């Protein structure tokens, strides 16, 4: 059979005369002739007739009904052949839906526009009720002379909602007197079937174009337009947020608006009564480090009481909280100003190498420590005296040269001093004289060395009870009324 069909197109199917032949006479006659010419002789005549009749009916159905419509809707052909049950499941009727409003970018909720609202929530899903209520609203709605009248995507909200119903301008037809005025170049096409009563909280209005002027329709004005006004009968509104924002947006609290307190009463922007927005004031305070010293970061905007505005801010005198730097007390005696304590003492205690430089800088100390004249070498002529003075400076009466020499070895590792080999009690600084003086005496301030101990301490680092005299008898403490005198041998008070 294949060798007979070389002159024809691929997969030519012979056909017999079909039941539905009107409108396709030439085609059926051609197929009938082809069938008679190329029919296989091995098939029984009756079976081939039935088979070709079924194929002819399917071919006719495909040719007549499987046409791509002009719209973008996907079309599924509906097979109503009487013999199609033998090849397919029982016949199913497919309902042809009207064109979805989601295909129109100007009417789709999912089409994001680049305009912002002061408040509200963004809607990302198209309405599932527009197709179901299109027929009802188209039959019951008033025929408008301007079907492209722009509807405000913002809900007309009032702080005091009407009992039972809520009128919203996004789903209202304005009166006929204002329809001709509302038709302008910025309007987007809106099918009258999309203006319908909504009874669900999932409904969201479509967004308008960027250049469209947002119109606020007065509820009293819109409700007087006859049968064109519709109501939403649910208590959970869907406020449109700006499409370009994907973060949480909170309302501005009028307590934070300083202009409202300064310039007098102004319209306050409170959130609507049906929306609960959690507001927490910014904490401008913290626990002060110094007890009794208030924080310098107290901010008036953190309080709701308007009387704080008269007190002003506490940014003027902040040195009482944290001083810029710790400096020695400045005293003035005899017309001369000096600081109590050297600058390096402000950064910590006096170090040993600084103490030695201070001793070498004073010529009156040449009898126990002096320069040798060979660079930065110096000799401890009386090392015990130097150790004693160092003990006075550090309030360590038990200081001796052995302890002092162990402290000097620390400077060997740090590269500050070195021990001169072959000579006893001779050391040298490894830096330049100018650098040594600069580091030892910052701001050219010589330290004031201590001449005596702050208090008398014996060699055993104990403080004797020198204020108590053994020879003086002290009166005993007055005994309690229920106790006798204490049998202490001496008059010490314990």
From Swiss-Prot:
Compositionally biased tracts (Low complexity): 176-187
Disulfide-bond pairs as recorded: none
Keyword Metal-binding recorded: no
DNA-binding region: 350-430
Keywords, ordered alphabetically: Activator, DNA-binding, Nucleus, Phosphoprotein, Transcription, Transcription regulation
Induction description: By the fibroblast growth factors FGF3 and FGF8.
Molecular function GO terms recorded: DNA-binding transcription factor activity, RNA polymerase II-specific; sequence-specific DNA binding
Biased composition range(s): Polar residues: 100-113, 188-197
Expressing tissues: In the embryo, expressed ubiquitously until the late blastula stage, in the marginal zone of gastrula stages, in the presumptive forebrain and hindbrain and in the trunk region of early somite stages. In later stages, also expressed in Rohon-Beard neurons, epiphysis, lateral line placodes, pectoral fin buds, developing lens and heart.
Source organism superkingdom: Eukaryota
GO terms under cellular component: nucleus
GO biological process, one term: regulation of DNA-templated transcription
Stated family: Belongs to the ETS family.
Other known facts: Transcriptional activation activity is enhanced by Raf1, ERK and PKA.
Function recorded in the entry: Transcriptional activator that binds to the (5'-CCGGA[AT]-3') motif. May control the acquisition of specific cell fates at an early stage during development of the somites and nervous system. May mediate the cellular effects of the fibroblast growth factors on embryogenesis.
PANTHER family recorded: ETS, ETS TRANSLOCATION VARIANT 4
Name of this protein: ETS translocation variant 4
Record gene name: etv4
């Amino acid at each position: 059979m294949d060798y007979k069909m070389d002159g024809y197109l691929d997969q030519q199917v012979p056909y017999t005369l079909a039941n539905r032949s009107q409108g396709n006479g030439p085609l059926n006659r051609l197929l009938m002739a082809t069938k008679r010419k190329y029919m296989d002789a091995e098939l029984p005549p009756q079976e081939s007739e039935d088979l070709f009749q079924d194929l002819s009916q399917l071919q006719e159905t495909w040719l007549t009904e499987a046409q791509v419509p002009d719209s973008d809707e996907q079309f599924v052909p509906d097979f109503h052949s009487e013999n199609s049950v033998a090849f397919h499941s029982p016949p199913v009727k497919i309902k042809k839906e009207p064109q979805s409003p989601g295909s129109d970018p100007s009417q789709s909720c999912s089409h994001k526009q680049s305009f912002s609202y002061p408040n509200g929530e963004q809607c990302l899903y198209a309405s599932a009720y527009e197709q179901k209520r299109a027929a009802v609203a188209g039959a019951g709605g008033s025929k408008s002379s301007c079907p492209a009248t722009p509807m405000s995507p913002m809900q007309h909200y009032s702080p005091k909602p009407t009992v039972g119903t809520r009128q919203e301008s996004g789903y209202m037809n304005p009166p006929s007197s204002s329809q001709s005025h509302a038709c302008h170049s910025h309007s987007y096409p809106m099918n009258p079937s999309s203006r319908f009563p909504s009874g669900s909280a999932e409904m969201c209005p479509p967004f308008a174009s960027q250049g469209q002027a947002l119109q606020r329709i007065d509820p009293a004005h819109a409700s007087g337009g006859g049968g064109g006004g519709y109501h939403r009968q649910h208590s959970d509104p869907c406020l449109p947020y700006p499409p370009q924002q994907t973060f949480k947006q909170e309302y501005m609290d009028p307590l934070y608006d300083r202009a409202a307190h300064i310039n007098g009463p102004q319209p306050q922007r409170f959130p609507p009564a049906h929306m609960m927005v959690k507001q927490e004031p910014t904490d401008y305070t913290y626990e002060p480090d110094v007890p009794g010293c208030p924080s310098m970061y107290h901010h008036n905007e953190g309080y709701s009481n308007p009387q704080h505005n008269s007190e002003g801010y506490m940014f003027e005198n902040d040195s009482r909280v944290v001083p810029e730097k710790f400096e020695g007390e400045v005293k003035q005696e005899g017309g001369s100003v000096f600081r109590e304590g050297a600058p390096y003492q402000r950064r910590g205690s006096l170090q040993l190498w600084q103490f030695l430089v201070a001793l070498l800088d004073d010529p009156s100390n040449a009898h126990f420590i002096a320069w040798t004249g060979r660079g930065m070498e110096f000799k401890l002529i009386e090392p015990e005296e130097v150790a004693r003075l160092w003990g006075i400076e550090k309030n360590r009466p038990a200081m001796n040269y052995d302890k002092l020499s162990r402290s000097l070895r620390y400077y060997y590792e740090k590269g500050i001093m070195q021990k001169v080999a072959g000579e006893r009690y001779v050391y040298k600084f490894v830096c330049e004289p100018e650098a040594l003086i600069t580091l030892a005496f910052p701001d050219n301030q010589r330290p004031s060395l201590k001449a005596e101990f702050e208090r008398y301490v014996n060699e055993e680092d104990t403080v004797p009870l020198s204020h108590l005299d053994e020879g003086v008898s002290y009166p005993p403490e007055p005994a309690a009324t229920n106790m006798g005198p204490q049998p202490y041998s001496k008059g010490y008070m314990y």
